């Protein structure tokens, strides 16, 4: 953990150095504000940015909870019923073939400008990696353990609970890590399409007023939220699935 934090700090410091040098190379401030200008915008607008951060965070966490629940449920349903799999898999794939930006206006139209549309957008982005990873893990259970369970006359439910589920947990962990990384995308897209709250709204509003420092400040907060969410999920998975090399 310490080594990972050290490497992350080195990368962050390098990016800050490159950013600072680029901002002093003659690029206009309204195109690329300096790191100090962004830090000042973060401090001066801390109450304003803090409120909108809470809105976006609640949308992300709501979408993550519902998206993971939906993904796990779909994967279990498809592994339990091959017929259901034949019907659901094309629908799951179709949901990812449609661009997220194309669905955002429709969700805002159907669900309104409140939080529901943003959470629904986050669910659409999140559920697929969870479904795909968990279903693949369930399907690739250790054949030797499955044969041993069958030789002991274990029922399908017992095989699923004691063999397939345990073997699929690392794959589910990979899906959860991916979901944590992409969770903010759906919420931000929903805020861009139609919202008066959240970091996506802050970025659009600041961009329209050429307040690039505030736009960068909101983007910095969003990146920080994503990294912290991913680290929280990764740390939790390492504690819960400590027997897995992954």
Model-derived features: where do they sit?
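Transmembrane-helix boundary motif in ABC transporter permease subunits
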Residues: 62-92
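N-terminal signal-anchor transmembrane alpha helix
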Residues: 2-26
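Generic hydrophobic transmembrane alpha-helix motif, especially the helices
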Residues: 93-129, 136-137
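Transmembrane alpha-helices
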Residues: 120-124, 157-190, 221-222, 233
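Short cytoplasmic-facing helical segments at TM-TM junctions of multi-pass membrane proteins
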Residues: 133-178, 199, 203
């Amino acid at each position: 953990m310490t080594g990972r934090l050290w490497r992350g700090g080195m990368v962050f410091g390098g990016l800050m150095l490159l950013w600072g040098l680029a901002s002093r190379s003659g690029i206009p401030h309204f195109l690329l504000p300096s790191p100090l200008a962004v830090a000042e915008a973060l401090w001066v607008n801390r109450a304003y940015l803090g409120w909108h951060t809470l809105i976006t965070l609640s949308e992300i966490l709501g979408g993550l909870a519902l998206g993971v629940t939906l993904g796990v449920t779909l994967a279990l349903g498809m592994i339990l019923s091959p017929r259901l799999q034949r019907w659901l898999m094309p629908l799951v794939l179709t949901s990812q073939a449609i661009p997220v930006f194309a669905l955002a206006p429709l969700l805002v139209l159907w669900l309104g400008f409140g939080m529901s549309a943003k959470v629904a957008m986050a669910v659409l982005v999140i559920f697929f990696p969870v479904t795909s990873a968990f279903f693949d893990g369930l399907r690739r259970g250790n054949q030797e353990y499955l044969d041993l369970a069958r030789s002991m006359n274990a029922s399908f439910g017992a095989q699923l609970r004691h063999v397939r589920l345990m073997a699929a947990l690392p794959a589910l962990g990979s899906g959860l890590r991916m979901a944590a990384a992409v969770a903010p995308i759906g919420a931000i897209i929903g805020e861009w399409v139609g919202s008066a709250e959240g970091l996506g709204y802050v970025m659009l509003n600041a961009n329209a007023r050429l307040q690039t420092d505030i736009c960068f400040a909101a983007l910095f907060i969003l990146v920080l939220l994503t990294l912290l969410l991913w680290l929280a999920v990764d740390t939790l998975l390492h504690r819960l699935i400590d027997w897995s090399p992954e």
